[in-house]
């Protein structure tokens, strides 16, 4: 055991370490020779996605004790998508570094990683991958479905929908008060297929959770049992020396990409999975997403791309059911690879039942023939851009319209409802200086608001282009992550009001219909914008 280096033997250091364990109240007979399991807990009073994890950590400990291990709980940074500004994206790598260094520096033999809110999952897995110990992930789980006057509500997705209705004058403060109370009713992360559900599902597809773990509602008693089972399993993994490098392989990342695309999942998964793969030495690229998206259909009928919510998905069979259906697509999954269960992915999903064929589809009844996220290229995005086309109005997937340009998010907020801009439903809204450096931190500004006077006319989607990200709960014909970003002089910086822009998702193209000579003249005149932050 790795921990024996700290506590075993008759040297001064071992004596000192055992003495300090006694100071903590633990005799040598309680921990010496047993796997020490770090429980990395992202619980916080200010993070509603994780507010139940203090209790769940106790259930993980129970499992560790039962299996003959010794649990030690570590509080780590909590990344709350709801409250942290300007964006928790700026802190993902900080949590990844904290995770890695805690696991490297303390006398632990394995780790249980607890979290679920958007950036937490990739951060914990990145850190654990670099540390290289046996590790298992316990997803926080989705909250219960919301309720508005008897109708199910999806967090994020229905918030945007009803906010647009309010801006259009269709509902008032009374309705908004009911919505405010009904949108989020329990602990857990968003119960739509937002970034949280997407990334915890990706973690399960990677094989770093127990089968079915990602779909269990946060407050379901099955979630308690899963936490305890994860505690038991990590002790076994330590004795088996089953480390992250045996789980997080190139095949595993390809399967995670296929799963995200079949779920109609968040565009943020593109950024996170590429970063996670990089930590594991796996060369995952935008081209891999593009290639896989062309052969993997959308099988999950979950908002914002579909009709249902994560609670329905769980009852319908959860991620094991979806993976079982995805396995029917030739070449979609690598069934022989190992997972933390000790078996193979194929064994996990071979007999996984599906109880509702409308929630979890088969290849013959797919919501779309191609994966939910498409990679775009062209003279406006030479290094690529993405669009969640499954959540856009089909009429906009091949569209040419005049640009209406906003230089930053503040200007967008001030001017979007200005009638003098003469924005029409055919206009293409462009937001720049919202990328990693320009934002800063690539905030989720990409679902640009539609002018209120168009909302009042019934317009609910427009082509919108930015170098920002958007929430996984968002929807619409939003082209995101345009690269290079405008702040460093990417082509987005050269767009002017009225320039024709063409989006063609089927052809994977994003083009600025302006002559190259004109663009060269504009580039010669371009000046980088002033930095808007001091640190």
Positions of predicted regions on the chain:
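Catalytic or ion-coupling anion/metal-binding cores of large enzyme and transporter domains
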Residues: 1-38, 42-45, 49-51, 56-76, ...
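Short, well-structured alpha-helical segments in soluble
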Residues: 94-106
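A short, small-residue-rich loop immediately preceding and capping a beta-strand
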Residues: 103-124, 135-140
